[in-house]
């Protein structure tokens, strides 16, 4: 039969695998991290809307999917809109589909002064996400890395004022976009700090900074400076 080296387990946990890879040691397989998101509802047998109100169901669905497929990271992520929603944006919550944006937080750039950074402990669905994070750390955190999604500052800006208005403002009212990115950055920092305090590492989604949406020039002017500050902040916390 096949001889196994005494120190090599037949199947490593994701954390063991990551540690071995970082040291350049032998691993049982390469890490694999699919973006399952709300697909976990199908595995667990709940409705996607259950994640809007129940931290326990959100955590248990994540765990069920992780146990079924054995991938290398569990991430608290339902949709792109819990953060703008926490700042006053309106969302559509289908019974069994992913939440979508209905109205941005402000209808006009002149209302920008009304925007305040979110409070992850009190606003919208964010307290549910934080509670789900705690369950995940308790239940599987010793064997698999648990991460928390956050949107980047420029994506925040687009969801706070609306995509079309924000992209127009990049040309016509650049100072407005900078203000939106700043309040987005402060919101992102508040949320990642709450997640890091629980023991998670943040992952940043910045879809509105894609080349399909903005040019590299616009990216360098508006998105990159705030994204860099967010990444630097996360690194300063040791993540």
Model regions and ranges:
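Short, structured active-site "lid" loops
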Residues: 50-60, 67-69
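Active-site loop segments of alpha/beta catalytic cores
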Residues: 3-41, 46-49, 61, 72, ...
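Flexible, glycine-rich active-site loops centered on histidine and acidic residues
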Residues: 45, 87, 111
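Short, basic/glycine-rich phosphate-binding loops at helix/coil junctions
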Residues: 105-116
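Glycine-rich, N-terminal phosphate-binding loop and its surrounding beta-alpha-beta segment
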Residues: 62-91
């Amino acid at each position: 039969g096949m001889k196994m080296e005494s120190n090599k387990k037949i199947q490593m946990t994701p954390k063991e695998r990551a540690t071995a890879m970082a040291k350049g040691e032998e691993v049982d397989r390469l890490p694999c991290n699919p973006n399952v998101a709300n697909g976990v509802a199908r595995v667990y047998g709940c409705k996607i809307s259950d994640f809007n109100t129940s931290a326990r169901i959100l955590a248990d669905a994540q765990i069920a999917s992780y146990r079924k497929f054995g991938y290398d990271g569990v991430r608290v992520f339902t949709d792109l809109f819990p953060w703008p929603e926490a700042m006053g944006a309106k969302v559509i919550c289908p019974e069994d589909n992913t939440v979508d944006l209905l109205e941005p937080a402000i209808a006009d750039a002149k209302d920008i002064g009304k925007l305040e950074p979110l409070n992850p402990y009190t606003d919208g669905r964010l307290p549910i996400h934080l509670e789900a994070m705690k369950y995940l750390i308790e239940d599987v955190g010793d064997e698999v890395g648990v991460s928390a999604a956050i949107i980047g500052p420029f994506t925040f800006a687009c969801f706070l004022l609306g995509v079309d208005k924000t992209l127009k403002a990049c040309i016509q009212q650049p100072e407005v976009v900078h203000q939106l990115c700043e309040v987005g950055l402060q919101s992102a920092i508040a949320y990642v700090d709450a997640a890091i305090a629980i023991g998670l590492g943040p992952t940043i989604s910045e879809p509105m900074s894609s080349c399909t949406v903005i040019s590299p020039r616009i990216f360098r002017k508006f998105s990159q400076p705030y994204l860099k500050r967010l990444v630097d902040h996360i690194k300063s916390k040791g993540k």
